[in-house]
Each structure stands twice: as C-alpha cells, then as structure tokens.
C-alpha cells in the first residue's frame, strides 16, 4: 500500500462528503505523509522514511534510533 506511514501504520480512511443539502458521497481521508530523512548517530548515516506528521512527533519524542530499532523488531526492513 502506497499511502501508509512506515512508523505508525496510518493509512487512508473512508468517509463521506456531506453537502449543505446533507447529500453524502464517498471520499477518502488521506494521512499527512512526508518523505523525510533522519540522521542516525548510531549508524552514522541518513535514514529515509515516509512518515505521517504524528510519526514526526513520535520521532522527536523518542529519537530516531529508538524508533528504527522498534521498526526492525517488528520485521520492517530499514
């Protein structure tokens, strides 16, 4: 799946457009994904990730090395 955050797993959701007349049509809510690269002190290299804005906040809080270790523990290739 293309529009999925590599850290949080956030993916598109399905909902409704609701007009002023209360007509409903299907729409997709897309996650706010950003292609970012992070400097890893432990590996002494740049790590590229496609992450949501919520994941950026998580990386700021925990640190990129901790987040990458968690990704590798669950089997993702980084």
Curated annotation (Swiss-Prot):
UniProt key word Magnesium: no
Pfam families: Ribosomal_L28 (PF00830)
GO cellular component term of the entry, any: cytosolic large ribosomal subunit
Biological process per Gene Ontology, one example term: translation
Keyword Membrane in record: no
Source organism superkingdom: Bacteria
GO MF entries: structural constituent of ribosome
InterPro entries, per the entry: Ribosomal_bL28, Ribosomal_bL28/bL31-like_sf, Ribosomal_bL28_bact-type, Ribosomal_bL28_sf
Protein name, UniProt field: Large ribosomal subunit protein bL28
The species this protein was found in: Azoarcus sp. (strain BH72)
Origin organism lineage: Bacteria, Pseudomonadati, Pseudomonadota, Betaproteobacteria, Rhodocyclales
